[in-house]
């Protein structure tokens, strides 16, 4: 089911603020809306901040790839869960659950190729691939081009934990919007000093991360369990490496310390290479007081209960794998 708002267009001469996520999808949404000359500034937000009302949203705002918040002028999304969560159809909520990215929803809404004839080559295909996680094993283990850019822009890769870069992620995003609008090739973009600084660190960590994952992994039937509790440092890596290293697994479970080792966190996900897992991860985590969506979720436990809960959850996953 899709909600569309085909009659709502930006007011002539009006400039809006874009509120989006700081990732590849957010970047391309910003490029598209800048091409239309309808945004003057960008705010990057986390989905939970939107749900918790921490971001003030009003009639001068356009949101993309974020939970729907009433009050925005237009809201674009492609998450099926939002159709359920938003419940009532809102005239300003453009949601196409079958679209691979929110950028694709924006692109199609404003007229596609006819409206955007000058986009950087390959950018729409790249954002669709990244946001739908349609990566190959080779993309994951030897990333280059747009795939590499998407991994260094993903906060979950974790590069920011290890270095104060020359410019912040926000400044980099703003720079990349302009470089993509100037129709630079992806090769040119990867040569930018502020991008190269991040890709160099990515590859430096990549080797250590692969060795760490292989060392910490234990296979439980179709599930790979990664226990990082004895690791002093968890190296930065794209979040799909575990699936490329263990192609026989269709799910992963990461065991991590909570804040100050006061509790234990389980982060559970489905493989993007072996897409045979049937269990609803979000529902499983919710049953333990956590949450998530169909393909990924987290829950946390008191340290003393974590081993019992781990065996229980492994059993449930393998029963439904």
Label the model's feature ranges:
Residues 130-222:
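Hydrophobic, aromatic-enriched interface-forming segments
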